[in-house]
């Protein structure tokens, strides 16, 4: 057999393959590569070199010191990384298609039926309250018989997980308060990237999550045994056995900024966008924008997506800053992926270099609906409160709130989507304050930047905070479209930076709204807090059960949703919805002080959701009229 190495670098003048028996070796075996007329460099070695570590030295005529850098193969299927600044890496030769999937296939699900749980692979098991035995995050996540991980996710009833970036990424940023590579780090005392929105390899799973470490080990090679490839598959297979689809959050609009040896060294002129002064464009805010319209860049993205589908059985993808990806690439991704799985899920952030959820919808993509998020919750908890607070944020009004119920369709004023299943309805994501913290601060019951010494007291919801959390959740789960919640939203998780962090964080003890760099209890789910707010957790479970059982909240026709007019109460809303001969009434009172009395259609109605509980088991019945106190919500079903 033979092992063939290829690298596309059309502007390079010389490329050398460097192989290593161990990644620690300072010098390896070097092989001069040959260039073809298409800009592809090639070297062929006799034998099948599985387990071999390798990289490329890429020389350009206009740059010095290129030969000092070992570049990572952009098509590497497994990667080992040395945990220090600049994240030096080596690719590993592995054999694909050797995993026993035990008959596993993709989960094909109508997008309207999706209930997505956005989560970080480590967060669900890293806190001791999860009850998980120390092991790698991939393995810990699927350990049975524990309070956290897959057991907790299954108990909620969600049917899809969306993993924060789990392609190999830049874990380590530049030294704090030091000049490095022309930059000065005055923003990140942790010198870490925990969320992973700095992709280093489009084809390899993140190696950190395959290590049996409680925290990142600095100055150590991780991923040497390529364990991530099998552990990632074990994880996907375990979720599929529970009927839970697996989506990946992927970042193709830029690459890892704080390292050498990536596509910027391989061929920056080909792969990146530049401004008219010759600097990297950074509409992503991450130092470089990937030139997705280049044929070989587009090909790499598409082949990456198809590889994750075929090799790892991934059911769907969420694209970070989707508007930075050119339209032709967006269209080809969906076209090629649907050949493999016609129900593959593609959603995105419809911003970054513009804002165009309608453009994505026209091309068959879903988008995160920031309009429902801001309209219902608000844009910020200080002076941008939304409907649940009895306020109108921006250009919201009762007409727009009604449009959110129907999927924010283009047929309504300021609508965004051609189809309801293109609207990813959410009130919380990894970005910004959690919904629980937004409400804590928005009510004035917790002051921003206050040092929180009693985290249990802070976590425990007041009666008013609980009402607002329930009202928001009820609106979310009864609206047409895709439903997404973020990990811990169901117990109003609070992201308090621990007082005992070992770095110079001036915000320690306060509530965080951008925890991307914290591999600590700020992000880890504390399941004791889920117990503290069990009433809210049970309410979420009941809403999930309700949505899954009754298609009226997922598949009702626009004409089958009929709104009830509430005179002189602008923040009250009601509607009836019919589907398959089953009729419901959904009622909300977001008024701050006023009760609302509503006349019901003729007949007897069972109560499925009241201000205390939610589910599919009737909580009582009612006829003729119903009175809603401020912040009450109800779902009634015709008896």
What do the PLM-derived regions correspond to, one by one?
Residues 7, 56, 119, 163, ...:
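Conserved, mostly hydrophobic/aromatic
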Residues 1, 25, 36-140:
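The feature marks proteins involved in alpha-glucan
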Residues 3-13, 545, 563-601:
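Carbohydrate-binding surface patches
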């Amino acid at each position: 057999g033979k092992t063939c190495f290829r690298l596309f670098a059309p502007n390079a003048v010389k490329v050398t393959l460097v192989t290593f028996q161990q990644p620690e070796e300072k010098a390896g075996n070097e092989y001069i590569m040959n260039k073809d007329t298409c800009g592809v460099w090639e070297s062929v070695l006799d034998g099948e070199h599985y387990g071999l570590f390798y990289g490329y030295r890429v020389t350009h005529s206009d740059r010095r010191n290129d030969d000092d850098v070992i570049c990572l193969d952009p098509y590497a299927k497994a990667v080992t990384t040395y945990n220090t600044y600049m994240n030096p890496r080596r690719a590993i030769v592995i054999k694909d298609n050797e995993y026993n999937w035990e008959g596993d296939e993709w989960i094909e699900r109508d997008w309207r039926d999706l209930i997505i749980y956005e989560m970080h692979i480590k967060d669900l098991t890293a806190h001791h309250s999860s009850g998980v035995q120390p092991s790698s995050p991939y393995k810990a996540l699927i350990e049975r018989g524990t309070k956290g991980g897959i057991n907790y996710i299954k108990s909620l009833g969600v049917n899809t997980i969306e993993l924060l970036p789990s392609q190999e990424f830049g874990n380590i940023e530049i030294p704090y308060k030091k000049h490095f590579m022309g930059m000065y780090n005055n923003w990140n005392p942790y010198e870490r990237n925990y969320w992973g929105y700095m992709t280093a390899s489009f084809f390899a799973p993140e190696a950190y999550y395959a290590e049996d470490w409680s925290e990142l080990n600095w100055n150590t090679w991780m991923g040497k045994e390529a364990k991530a490839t099998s552990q990632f598959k074990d994880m996907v297979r375990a979720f599929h056995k529970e009927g839970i689809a697996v989506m990946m959050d992927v970042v193709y609009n830029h690459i890892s900024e704080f390292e050498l040896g990536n596509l910027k060294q391989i061929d920056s002129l080909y792969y990146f966008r530049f401004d008219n002064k010759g600097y990297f464009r950074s509409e992503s805010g991450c130092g470089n924008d990937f030139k997705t319209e280049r044929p070989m860049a587009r090909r790499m993205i598409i082949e990456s997506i198809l590889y994750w589908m075929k090799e790892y059985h991934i059911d769907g993808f969420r694209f970070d800053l989707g508007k930075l990806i050119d339209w032709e690439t967006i269209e080809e991704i969906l076209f090629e992926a649907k050949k493999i799985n016609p129900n593959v899920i593609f959603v995105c952030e419809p911003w970054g270099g513009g804002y165009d959820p309608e453009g994505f919808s026209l091309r068959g993509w879903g988008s995160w609906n920031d309009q429902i998020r801001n309209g219902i919750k608000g844009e910020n908890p200080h002076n941008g409160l939304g409907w649940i607070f009895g306020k109108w944020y921006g250009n919201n009004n009762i007409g727009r709130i009604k449009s959110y119920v129907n999927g924010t369709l283009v047929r309504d004023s300021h609508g965004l989507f051609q189809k309801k299943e293109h609207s990813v309805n959410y009130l919380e994501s990894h970005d910004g304050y959690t919904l629980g913290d937004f409400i804590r601060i928005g009510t004035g019951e917790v002051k921003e930047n206050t040092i929180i010494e009693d985290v249990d007291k802070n976590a425990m919801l007041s009666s008013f905070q609980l009402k607002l959390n329930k009202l928001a959740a009820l609106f979310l789960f009864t609206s047409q479209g895709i439903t997404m919640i973020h990990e811990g939203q169901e117990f109003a998780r609070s992201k308090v930076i621990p007082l005992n962090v070992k770095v110079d964080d001036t915000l320690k003890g306060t509530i965080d709204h951008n925890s991307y760099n914290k591999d600590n209890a700020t992000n880890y789910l504390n399941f004791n807090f889920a117990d503290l707010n069990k009433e809210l957790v049970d309410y979420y479970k009941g809403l999930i059960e309700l949505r899954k059982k009754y298609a009226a909240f997922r598949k009702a026709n626009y004409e089958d949703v009929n709104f009830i007019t509430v005179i002189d109460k602008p923040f009250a809303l009601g509607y009836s919805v019919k589907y398959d001969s089953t009729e419901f009434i959904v009622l909300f009172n977001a008024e701050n002080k006023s009760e609302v009395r509503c006349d019901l259609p003729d007949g007897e109605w069972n109560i499925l959701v009241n201000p205390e509980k939610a589910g599919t088991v009737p909580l009582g019945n009612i006829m003729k009229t119903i009175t809603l106190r401020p912040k009450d919500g109800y779902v009634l079903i015709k008896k």
